[in-house]
């Protein structure tokens, strides 16, 4: 609040400004902001952070960043010079971007719009951004008639890269243009710009699965590089503090429940550093808002991954080929260029969309002859402690330990625990919606004619309940029994305190009408689990118990379902595929992206003992959250 008062205190009252002679009415955006009483450094930072779009945009930025602890930090932004295509070729590249993502999934090239890199990222002080634009304008005017039209491009493919390379003669001209810009920028702004020294190209795809190469190559061959195209030299900037962060976009609103939480507004972007996630709770991440500059904890299911360039700021551009006067494309006032880019759909952030590809259901028993064995691994459903908070027990248990349902998403009843209701603190059940999620998955398996022969699950109650409801959806709850396997429990390092949860024994689970096999002898009993085990121990335990489960079921049915934790989808399948486990930091980041009822399918390759991930026989399950609602607090007037 102090920061807010300080910002407002520096704005001269309106009546005083109107009476003061010499008030700037038609000056530059900076002059107008200064006349409004904003400090010069803040005004320059606001203009740089909004691309000099307008005084209004700069004012909005300043007021939204009142609580930004780095508002007065002199750290400059990072800038880059790209060539971007416009016209028919740009549309063709846009089509390739969309088709390749839809058919083969996202690869690294999708993080940034189609472009040719002319220089490395460089820093420029906020006060010198206008001069940087002048440097680009001067350079373009000198080189305007020296470029080939159309720019000659050649398709190149390798095992993990596809691109359009600029032919050597034209590439040399572009490199000299970039070097001239670097010299002009150094002269006008004293910044150091390093021209791109590698072969100039438009990246179409890289870091993709080898199996996708033929499809991507065929799509790339459909791009007619001789189509009409104007290329524009464009400057973008980004906040240097978040250069190595993951970019996320908010899809649902969230109002903070605690002081360390971040308010979420749909459409805002969040920067997340993997290094800052080591101490966060399951289901939460720590991030920084683009709109406010504030940092805090936020629920991970309220956001989705966004392209790296989604938060970049467009500063202006000039055509290097056509004869339009540069004055019509004024630097720092990029409305025309911005509209052109939005019309092309390049680099913009699209609204949340679910694209369902035609999927052939896995009909396991529809073909005669030997069948391939399949392993399905599924995460549990929505859990009570995540939805209702760490102290959820106080909301639904009275002083005598009696369960009282206080929300429609709470189950009608809970199993009795021999150790008392406090055992639920470390072993929470799933919600009503969690049960519904699980039944939906079971019904989808039934509709796809997928037969499940064996079901194993972690001893966590949320996993047992999820497995039971999947069987209900499959209409197999009276025929199949769940084998509770402690070896499938998640990484014990994530368990709070010095003891493991006091899980409900199989006999008591069965007494609570859950379809549990009370005769099953686990491969890894509870006594063999160690608290705070190492990452290697957890990965090896998961792999070992999965191998033993597969061996146990051989010749007794082809399909095994494991219901466990988000980490299980990776830990139980990685080494089955002959792959080495990833490091613990990457593992943790991957696990955060697996939602409730996340489902994967692994198929054995003949009798080789090697398995591979395949398309699941069911569609994915996506849903949005619903925040708490109290009609008295919201509707009742004082």
Curated annotation (Swiss-Prot):
Gene3D superfamilies per record: Cyclic phosphodiesterase, DNA helicase RuvA subunit, C-terminal domain, Phosphoglycerate mutase-like, SH3 Domains
Domain SH3: 243-308
Any one biological process term the GO annotation gives: collagen-activated tyrosine kinase receptor signaling pathway
Modified residues (Phosphothreonine): 12
Catalysed reactions, semicolon-separated: O-phospho-L-tyrosyl-[protein] + H2O = L-tyrosyl-[protein] + phosphate
EC number: 3.1.3.48
Region (Protein tyrosine phosphatase) location: 369-638
Modified residues (Phosphoserine): 9
Molecular function terms, GO-annotated: identical protein binding; phosphoprotein binding; protein tyrosine phosphatase activity; ubiquitin protein ligase binding
Pfam families: His_Phos_1, SH3_9, UBA_7
Residue stretches making up the UBA domain: 23-65
Disrupted-gene phenotype: Mice display strikingly elevated levels of tyrosine phosphorylated, ubiquitinated proteins following TCR stimulation. They are prothrombotic and have shorter bleeding times, which is attributed to insufficient SYK dephosphorylation in platelets.
Signal sequence, renumbered to the chain: none
Record carries keyword Ribosomal protein: no
Keywords recorded for this protein, A-Z: Cytoplasm, Hydrolase, Nucleus, Phosphoprotein, Protein phosphatase, SH3 domain
UniProt note on tissues of expression: Detected in splenic T-cells and B-cells, total spleen, skeletal muscle, heart, lung, kidney, thymus, brain and liver (at protein level). Highly expressed in brain. Detected in heart, spleen, lung, liver, kidney and testis.
Broad class of the protein's primary localization: cytoplasm
Subunit field text: Homodimer. Interacts with JAK2 (in vitro). Interacts with CBL. Part of a complex containing CBL and activated EGFR. Interacts with ubiquitin and with mono-ubiquitinated proteins. Interacts with ZAP70 (ubiquitinated form).
Biological role: Interferes with CBL-mediated down-regulation and degradation of receptor-type tyrosine kinases. Promotes accumulation of activated target receptors, such as T-cell receptors and EGFR, on the cell surface. Exhibits tyrosine phosphatase activity toward several substrates including EGFR, FAK, SYK, and ZAP70. Down-regulates proteins that are dually modified by both protein tyrosine phosphorylation and ubiquitination.
Name of the protein in its database record: Ubiquitin-associated and SH3 domain-containing protein B
Lineage, uppermost ranks: Eukaryota, Metazoa, Chordata, Craniata, Vertebrata
């Amino acid at each position: 609040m102090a920061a807010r008062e300080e910002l407002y205190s520096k704005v001269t009252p309106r009546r005083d400004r109107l009476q003061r002679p010499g008030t700037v009415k038609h000056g530059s955006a900076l002059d107008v902001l200064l006349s409004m009483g904003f400090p010069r450094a803040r005004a320059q930072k606001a203009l740089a952070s909004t691309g000099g779009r307008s005084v209004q945009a700069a004012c909005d930025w300043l007021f939204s960043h009142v609580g930004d602890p780095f508002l007065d930090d002199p750290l400059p932004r990072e800038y880059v010079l790209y060539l971007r295509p416009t016209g028919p070729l740009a549309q063709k590249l846009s089509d390739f971007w969309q088709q390749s993502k839809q058919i083969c999934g996202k690869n690294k090239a999708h993080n940034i719009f189609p472009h040719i890199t002319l220089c490395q990222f460089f820093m420029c002080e906020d006060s010198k951004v206008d001069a940087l634009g002048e440097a680009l304008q001067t350079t373009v005017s000198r080189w305007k008639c020296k470029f080939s039209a159309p720019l000659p491009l050649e398709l190149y493919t390798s095992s993990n890269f596809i691109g359009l390379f600029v032919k050597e003669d034209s590439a040399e001209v572009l490199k000299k243009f970039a070097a001239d810009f670097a010299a002009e920028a150094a002269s006008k702004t004293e910044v150091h710009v390093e021209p791109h020294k590698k072969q100039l190209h438009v990246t179409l795809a890289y870091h993709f699965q080898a199996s996708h190469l033929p499809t991507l190559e065929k799509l790339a061959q459909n791009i007619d590089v001789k189509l009409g195209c104007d290329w524009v030299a464009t400057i973008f900037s980004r906040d240097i503090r978040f250069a190595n962060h993951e970019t996320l976009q908010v899809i649902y609103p969230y109002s903070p429940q605690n002081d360390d939480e971040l308010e979420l507004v749909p459409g805002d972007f969040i920067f997340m550093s993997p290094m800052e996630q080591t101490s966060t709770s399951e289901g939460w991440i720590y991030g920084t808002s683009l709109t406010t500059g504030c940092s805090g904890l936020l629920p991970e299911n309220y956001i989705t991954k966004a392209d790296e360039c989604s938060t970049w700021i467009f500063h202006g551009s000039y055509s290097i080929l056509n004869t339009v006067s540069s004055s019509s494309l004024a630097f720092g006032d990029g409305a025309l260029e911005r509209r052109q880019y939005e019309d092309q759909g390049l680099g913009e952030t699209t609204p949340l969309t679910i694209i369902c590809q035609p999927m052939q259901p896995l009909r396991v028993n529809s073909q005669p002859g030997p069948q391939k064995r399949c392993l399905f691994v599924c995460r549990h459903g929505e859990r009570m402690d995540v939805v209702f908070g760490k102290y959820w027990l106080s909301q639904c248990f009275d002083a005598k330990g009696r369960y009282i349902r206080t929300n429609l998403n709470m189950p009608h009843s809970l199993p009795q625990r021999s150790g008392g209701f406090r055992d639920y603190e470390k072993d929470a059940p799933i919600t009503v919606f969690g049960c519904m999620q699980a039944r939906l998955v079971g019904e989808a398996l039934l509709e796809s004619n997928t037969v499940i022969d064996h079901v194993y699950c972690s001893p966590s109650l949320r996993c047992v309940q999820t497995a039971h409801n999947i069987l209900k959806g499959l209409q197999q709850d009276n025929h199949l029994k769940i084998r509770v396997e402690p070896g499938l429990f998640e990484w014990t390092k994530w368990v709070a305190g010095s003891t493991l949860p006091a899980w409900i024994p199989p006999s008591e689970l069965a007494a609570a009408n859950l379809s549990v096999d009370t005769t099953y002898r686990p491969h890894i009993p509870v006594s063999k689990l160690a608290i705070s085990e190492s990452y290697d121990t957890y990965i090896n335990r998961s792999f070992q118990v999965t191998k033993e489960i597969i061996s146990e079921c051989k010749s007794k049915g082809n399909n095994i379902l494991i219901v466990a934790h988000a980490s299980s989808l990776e830990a139980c399948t990685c080494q089955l595929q002959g792959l080495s486990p990833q490091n613990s930091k990457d593992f943790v980041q991957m696990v955060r992206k697996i939602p409730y009822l996340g489902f994967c399918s692994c198929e054995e390759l003949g009798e080789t003992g090697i398995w591979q991930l395949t398309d699941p026989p069911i569609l994915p399950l996506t849903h949005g959250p619903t925040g708490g609602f109290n009609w008295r607090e919201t509707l009742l007037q004082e």
